[in-house]
């Protein structure tokens, strides 16, 4: 039986394009303190630019101590998962390496990469039998993180779509990468002032209270910050995002000096779809309630009985999708968490309360409903 210590420890590097993943990778390889490190680099282009940078960086790859595997023209969280399985399996079986570093592409979500380690092959074996996820690292660009989050650009508009009908936005991706991290490397701090750096660190701590935040410039982390931390735990990772903790009643202490806080809205009645739509499209992003960086939770709409919706907003982008059949015995129809700077929680709560359906409206017939139709197949039993 392969023990925890014997299995090949794996660190996965995530982060949006330009955040500094390859610079950090080069720094780790150049300061690896005698450790034997294998590297898998994933780049979406036909020519693997990241692999070339690693080869030409300060850490020349030794054929005896290190191995560089290139994966191009696809993303390891979807099209190249079988290739990733094969490569990690091979490297683990060789038994020559102390650590494996995987640099995912700038448009990869970390959770599917992590799930690869639990993916069962045809023979029933999993990658986790030979290798173990040790640390999920996300590199954040201190200069561009908040502007990109607020921008709301679609990946397809930048030519960064991963698959057909890829509807994700930059905001979605940034939030996924931050919320699933064990370690968040806040990079490029030499390019921002102290106040901005402190506010960013506090914001990231609110979005993912469980992650360790490592402030650096030029990707210069200590090797022990990203290798051999034994920080990854799938169950903990799924409960790590700040919004999940708030809904569970695990309130994160306020970081008042930076003006970052959170508020929870709960209600028993469903929302009036017309009033809620007006609030979402005109009120939420107006600044009247502060700057809402993240909101997420569960909600119901009058006129759509039996269905619970998932509310997910990151920066300027909000999504509303059906997620489950409604439990008639559940105490609340609405459970929403809002995280942001300068939040006016009372005003936000009052505005949301004003969107709830009234007793008179319940039996008054069809309500104005501008929300897109929901495909509830597979969500609600017919």
Please place each PLM-identified region on the residue numbering.
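C-terminal accessory "lid"/substrate-recognition subdomains
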Residues: 2, 145, 154-334, 345, ...
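Nucleotide-state-sensitive switch-loop elements of NTP-binding domains
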Residues: 2-172
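Conserved beta-strand segments of the P-loop GTPase G domain that flank and frequently precede/overlap
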Residues: 40-42, 138-141, 185-188, 264-266, ...
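Small/polar loops that bind or transfer phosphate-bearing groups
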Residues: 41, 79-80, 102, 215, ...
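Residue-level signal for inorganic ion chemistry
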Residues: 43, 103, 136, 181, ...
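Conserved strand-to-helix beginnings and helix N-cap segments that scaffold or border functional pockets
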Residues: 51, 81, 111-114, 194-198, ...
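Short, aromatic/basic amphipathic alpha-helical patches
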Residues: 52-58, 201-204, 350-354
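Fold-independent oxyanion-binding glycine-rich loops
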Residues: 104-105, 140-142, 188-189, 314, ...
């Amino acid at each position: 039986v392969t023990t925890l210590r014997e299995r090949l420890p794996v660190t996965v590097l995530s982060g949006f394009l330009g955040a500094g993943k390859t610079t950090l990778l080069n720094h780790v390889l150049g300061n690896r303190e005698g450790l034997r490190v294998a590297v898998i680099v994933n780049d979406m282009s036909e020519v693997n630019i990241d692999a070339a940078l690693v080869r030409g960086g300060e850490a020349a790859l030794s054929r005896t101590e290190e191995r560089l595997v290139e994966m191009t023209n696809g993303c390891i969280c979807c099209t190249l998962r079988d290739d990733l399985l094969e490569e990690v399996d091979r490297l683990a079986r060789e038994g020559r390496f102390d650590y494996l570093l995987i640099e995912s592409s700038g448009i990869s979500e970390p959770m599917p990469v992590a799930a690869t380690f639990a993916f069962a092959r045809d023979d029933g074996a999993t990658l986790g039998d030979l290798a173990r996820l040790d640390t999920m690292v996300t590199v954040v660009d201190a200069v561009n993180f908040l502007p990109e989050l607020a921008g709301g650009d679609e990946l397809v508009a930048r030519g960064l779509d991963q698959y057909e009908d890829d509807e994700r936005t930059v905001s979605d991706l940034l939030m996924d990468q931050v919320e699933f991290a064990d370690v968040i490397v806040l990079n490029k701090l030499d390019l921002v002032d102290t106040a901005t750096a402190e506010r960013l660190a506090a914001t990231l701590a609110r979005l993912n209270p469980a992650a360790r935040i490592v402030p650096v410039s030029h990707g210069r982390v200590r090797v022990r910050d990203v290798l051999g931390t034994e920080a990854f735990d799938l169950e903990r990772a799924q409960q790590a995002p700040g919004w999940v903790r708030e809904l569970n009643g695990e309130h994160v202490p306020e970081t008042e000096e930076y003006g970052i806080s959170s508020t929870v809205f709960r209600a028993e009645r469903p929302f009036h779809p017309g009033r809620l739509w007006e609030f979402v499209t005109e009120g939420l992003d107006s600044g009247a309630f502060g700057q809402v960086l993240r909101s997420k939770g569960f909600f119901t709409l009058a006129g759509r009985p039996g269905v619970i919706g998932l509310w997910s907003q990151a920066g300027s982008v909000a999504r509303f999708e059906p997620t489950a059949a409604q439990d008639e015995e559940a105490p609340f129809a609405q459970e929403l968490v809002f995280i942001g700077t300068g939040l006016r929680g009372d005003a936000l709560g009052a505005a949301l309360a004003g969107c709830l359906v009234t007793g008179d409206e319940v039996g008054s017939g069809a309500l104005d409903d501008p929300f897109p139709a929901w495909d509830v197949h597979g969500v609600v039993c017919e």
